Every structure is written in structure tokens, then in C-alpha cells.
């Protein structure tokens, strides 16, 4: 049994957390861990009195929070697209680059040419780097195989990964091939029962799948026992976020072009709005999710990195910082979006908050209070990362 003492402890008290819900901010705090599980939380004075014989790890100058959960990544691919940054700076849009054979199509080519073992090595290295920034659970999608055999291959690689943290697997129906769109959807429907992932996700947008195709795919996935996620309203609004009324979608992601009236549909459905501020930066767009309406209607907000060849960021700390400076979340909202609500978007209710009975996925930060997680930009502030009570990184 171990007691971790900290200058400040911050956690949501419920999952999902909604705007103006209560939050625990405990100064001179302590957490008790036994066998990888949190068994007690309180002030240092309370905890040392209740557990006088436990070992003590004293981080009395530091902040402790739940481990970060990254609920939206595209970690499994080969190659890079750094040349496309110059094209974007010259005025080409993401959609234009994709339609000319770049973007996703370019990454598909690199990924197909890379062996299973090399892809697995790439994936494992990326997960390890994400962990060093405080991520203790990560969602990873397929999506860069394009043809069905390649997508099932990527799903097999995903399921074989050996990782120091938990990996939630998603079969992403990413983008249709340049020709044979109708037949491709039929092939997807046949393949879904064989994916073996936890989630199925569809990129529903102007350059990807339309609403009817997305509805058909997600309905089939739900019937096959998969949980559902959705890329919605990223590049344009074509009606994708309306699907939360019809299907049990755990998380609707991006939402840059979601009309305010659709926020009510999201709120009523219980779907989490997963926002991806790094992508807003890399798309060089002025569009932003309707945050004020989400707050008003108390939609649970999560954030993720959206790591991909288009937004090369494994660092959830950066997502927190940009959620504050680009989207206007408070540091406290951003932290909870990266912990309790990110976990809830994956329906992982055994982590993401610091409470007795929850898994001891925790981060000790080299800062004195939670404000510094956004106030200081650009440094890795994670001092100690704990997965089920075991240290993963210590500086």
C-alpha cells in the first residue's frame, strides 16, 4: 500500500462531467493505492491518520490528476506528409490536397508498402511517446488501408500490440476509393463482423461518406455488437451530427461546422462531443465548435490529439493548451475533458477520476496547481506517470 502526497489534487466527481458540475480541488492532498486500485482520497492529514503504516511517496510541491485519456488517434500508419504543410500555406485546402491524390490517399500508399512488423514497431513507439506526456489510455483507429483486406490487416495489427497502457481499438471506415464507391460500402458491410475491434467509426463528410452511407455502416456495426463513434461536421455540415438521434453513438468528434441547433440533439442523445483542437490549428481554419451552446445545454465535452499525418501531435498536454487558447475552455474544463470525459467517451468508467475503487491511472505534474497545465506552454510537465499504480516514467 502506498500513499502519494501532493500539493494539489484535482478530479471530476462524476462521469460524464457537465458544465458547472462539482469538481474536487484538494490542497495538501493524498491518494492511497493498493494492488493498482485507489482505496482512499483526502487531505494529507486525514490520510496519514487513517493509514499510518503505508509507504509514502511525497510530491508535496506537485499537482496530481487522473491519467490523461486520448480518445481519438490515427496512430497506425507509415510515412509522413510534411510537404503538404507548404501547400496549405500556399492556399490549398485539405480537401483540395486529398482530391488530388494527396492526404489520406498518400498515407494509404505508404502504409500498404510497409510490413506488419514494421507497422507494429511504429505503433508501439508512438504509444510509448504518448505515455511520456501523461497518456494512460489511448484509442487507436485503422483507416489507412482503404481496401477491405488491408483494413482487416490493420485491425489485426492493432489487436496484437503490446503496450504499457490500455489501447482501445477502432475500425475506421475512413474514405471511399476513387472508383467503385457503392460496391465498397457493400464490402465494408461484409467485413465489419470480422474486424474484432471495440468500436466502429465512420468519417462522415463532404470528401468521405455521406449521411446515408454512414447510417447504413453504423447500423450494421451496432447490429454486430460494436460500439459506435463518428467523425462529424469536420470540413462541412452535411447532416452527419443528426445521426446521434438515430444511433447509439458514444462520441461525435470534430464538430467544427455543427449548427447550434444540432447541439440540442447531441445533448439529448447522451453522446460525448469530442473536440480536437490540434486539428483546428493544422487545418488552418477559423471554424470552431459551438462551445457556448455546448455549455448551455451541458453536453459532455472531451478532447483528444487526433494524431495523424495531418496533425502530428502525440501530446495530450498540447491538446489541453490549445483547448484553452483556441477554443476558450477554462484550464479546469480542459483537464476534465482530457480525463473523465475522454474516458467516458470510450465508456471506460473505471478510470478518469480519482475515487476509491477506480484504477490508479495517475499523473504527477511538475507544476503546483492545475492552472499551470495551460498557463505554461510547450514543456513536458509530466513528472511521474502511473498505470495501475506502477510508475511508467519518472524525471
From Swiss-Prot:
One of the record's GO cellular component terms: cytoplasm
User: Where found in the cell?
Assistant: Cytoplasm
Entry superkingdom: Archaea
Q: Which keywords does UniProt give here?
A: Cytoplasm, Histidine metabolism, Hydrolase, Iron, Metal-binding, Zinc
Q: Which residues bind N-formimidoyl-L-glutamate?
A: 144
Tell me a GO biological process for this protein. L-histidine catabolic process to glutamate and formate
Q: What residues does Fe(3+) bind to?
A: 72, 74, 231, 306
Q: What is its main location?
A: cytoplasm
Cited Pfam families: Amidohydro_3, HUTI_composite_bact
Binding, Zn(2+): 72, 74, 231, 306
PANTHER family in UniProt: IMIDAZOLONEPROPIONASE, IMIDAZOLONEPROPIONASE-RELATED
> What gene name does this entry carry?
hutI
The name on file for this protein is Imidazolonepropionase
The EC number(s) this enzyme carries: 3.5.2.7
InterPro entries in alphabetical order: Amidohydro_3, HutI, Metal-dep_hydrolase_composite, Metal_Hydrolase, MQNX/HUTI_composite_N
